[in-house]
Amino acid sequence: MVELGGRAGKSGAFPRRRGYRAVMDVTFTKESGRRYLMTVVRDRGPELAPRHGPGYHDYLPHDAAHFLVEAEARLTGGAFGRIEAGQSNMFWPADNRLLRHQKRRESKRKPSAAEHAQMGRSEDLASVCQVLWELRAGHRSEPPSWFDRVPSENLESGLTERILARLDEFAARWHALPVGHSITLTWPPNNHNRRAGARPAGARR
C-alpha cells in the first residue's frame, strides 16, 4: 500500500534497524499558480534538491500519477525505483559540488533492458490509467484518438483496477488540499510504518 503522510528525521535519513528495508518519501506540495513541488527524502544516494513537477492537474499531477502506477505495478526499474536506488533521474543533488560527480557516475551506468522495459510500461500504464480515471470521474467526455489501440488487458486487468483505486484516493486528497500543504507517498509501497495524512509543507511531527 502507498502510504500518505510520514517524514524522515531532521537529518534527512531514516533510522536503520536490523532487517530494515531502504525507503524513500516523495512529498508533493501544492503551490499557487497551478504548480507543485516535489521533495525526495531517501536512504541511498546524495540528498536531492526539490524541483517543480511537470503537468499540473487539479486532481492528478503528472509525476504523482507515475509514482502511484509504478508503486502498484512494482516497477522498480521505473523513474521512482531508480531514484530510490540512488540515481538522480529527473532530480539533481542539493549540494552543487556533487553535481558533476553524480552526472559522470550515472552516465557510466546504462539502464538494463529490464529497466527500459519497465520505464516503457510505466509510461503506458500512466497514460491509460489517467484517461480511464478522467472518464470514470466525469472529467473527460471521450477518450483520445489513440485509445482504441490500447490492448484490452491494459483496460480491464486487476492491476488497472488497483491503480485506479490508488488514483481515486490521491485525487480526492489532492483536490481538497489547500495551497502550501502536501501529501507524502512512501516507497517501497509495502512499507507500512507511516501514518496517513496531509499537512502544511515543512511541518514536523
Task: Give the ranges of each region predicted by the language model.
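Canonical SH2 domain fold
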Residues: 38-40, 50
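Hydrophobic/aromatic-lined pockets within catalytic cores
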Residues: 69, 73, 77
